[in-house]
Amino acid sequence: IVSFQSSAETKQRLEKFFLEFERAKQRKSSIRIVHYGDSQIEGDRVSGKIRSELRKELGGYGQGMIPIYTQSVPNGVSYTYSSNWEFYSVLKPIKGFNRYGLPLSAIKAIEDSSSAKASLSIHFHRLPQCDLKIYYSSPNRENRILISNDQTQISDVAVAAGANLKHIVIPKEQITTNLKLECDAGLELYGLDISAD
C-alpha cells in the first residue's frame, strides 16, 4: 500500500469529485472523465485500472474517445488516409488552426488534384460493443459525409457550414471491422467515441 501526502485543498477537490459521482447516480446520468497522460505511449496500466474500478462501481463501458490522428497507435483502431488530408496536433501547432477537439488533434480534408473526395478507412481490431460517434465540423463550407461498411452505404449526412462541433452516430449493429468515410474538402474530423453509459 502506498500513501500519498496531500494538502487540505487537494482533499477538498477530491471530495467534490466523488460527490459528483453520487449526484450522477441519483440523477441516473453519466460523467465523462478525460485523462491526458503517457498511457498512449506506455500502455494503459494505471489509468486502465482506475477506469476498471470506476466502471465496476458506476457502470459504463467501451474504449472512450479515440483520436482520429495520433503519433502513437491507439488500442484497437487503425486508420488509412487518402493523400488529401492535413494533420494537426497541439504538440506541433500550425498557425491559424486551433480546433483540435478533445483528443488534441484533428485532420482536415483539402483540395487535391488526385482525388475529388477525401477518404478515411477505419479498421477495428475488435468490433465495438456499443455505438460509434464520429466528431466533426465544416467551418467554411457545406459538405457531405458518406460512410460505408464493406461496400454498403450506412450513412449519408449533409453538413451545414459552421465551426460548431457535431457528431454522427453509427449503431453498433452497422459497424463492421472496416468502415470507410468519404467527404469533400473543408471537413474537419476530431475523434471517435466508443463508449456507453
State each model region's role.
Residues 1-36, 40-197:
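N-terminal secretory targeting modules
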